[in-house]
């Protein structure tokens, strides 16, 4: 789960991380009012969407008068903001963050992720923060410094100081940088985050260290113990199909192709998509119905896939372990009838009650294309999607 920058800063503030004063707003008039309350002479008008690269996309503007605050708010609020993370369609800006300006002397970068190899949280930092940190990581990886943190001790003072020194924080500002690094680590740990970034972390002209941005992603499997994080969820920022799928415990991710995939098991789902691409097709989605799929879940899965206007065929690929093939067959038949299926449907089943499932499909009277192997299923669905079946 992702949250907005201003929400991330609320979390950072709770953990003692210095952030600029700011106010989230939903209208142009409120933006001007917020700027008046914050006081000038400089403000930053920032689009709030769940994507990076807002500055390059025109979603962050520095205003030097209240008239400019109004002008920039009118420009940004309601725009389709296109960044390298949104795709060509962009994301609509429904809210802004009006923030006090800062005297930026140097931009740094700090981020935390989980390293699954070492099974530790890794703190990354660079002296080259700002909008082009991805380019820095790609072209000059030696400028990215890392520390794997022992979970038994947390981020120690010496580790924080070493990292801060490597990225150019002067000695006089080390206590502030240490507090920010340790606060960010503690926030990451206590909220079950999967990613946390401050980009940029700035040094000001008078030696202050301030988090000028905040990005958090959270482990969705841990949200049950963080109702305060769930309260930050903004459904307007999420794919409507993915939101609908989550209501039925379906793991669904929209993709850019035209072949719908309904599979049980994440590994098999990824292998299925790879095989479709191997034979020249493009998956329209990732969809894992899990091991406890019911007729209702399969029907809802079909409904969600069919809302995609680009869909031209569907592949159902089932390995019957915990999930019985006859249950899936029953669901496929019911779903096909319920939605009046008009696109070609390829079904491949292996495992528990496989013969019964195949018999049910064959006797259903529906124009279902059967396949015995994943390769055959992929070839058939690619051909069907192209109108060659």
Swiss-Prot record:
Its cofactor is Mg(2+). One of its GO terms (molecular function) is magnesium ion binding. Its EC number is 6.2.1.5. ATP binds at residues 46, 53-55, 99, 102, 107. Residues 9-244 form the ATP-grasp domain. GO terms for cellular component: cytosol; succinate-CoA ligase complex. Pfam families: ATP-grasp_2 (PF08442), Ligase_CoA (PF00549). It catalyses: succinate + ATP + CoA = succinyl-CoA + ADP + phosphate; GTP + succinate + CoA = succinyl-CoA + GDP + phosphate. Belongs to the succinate/malate CoA ligase beta subunit family. This is Succinate--CoA ligase [ADP-forming] subunit beta. It comes from Paraburkholderia phytofirmans (strain DSM 17436 / LMG 22146 / PsJN). The gene is sucC.
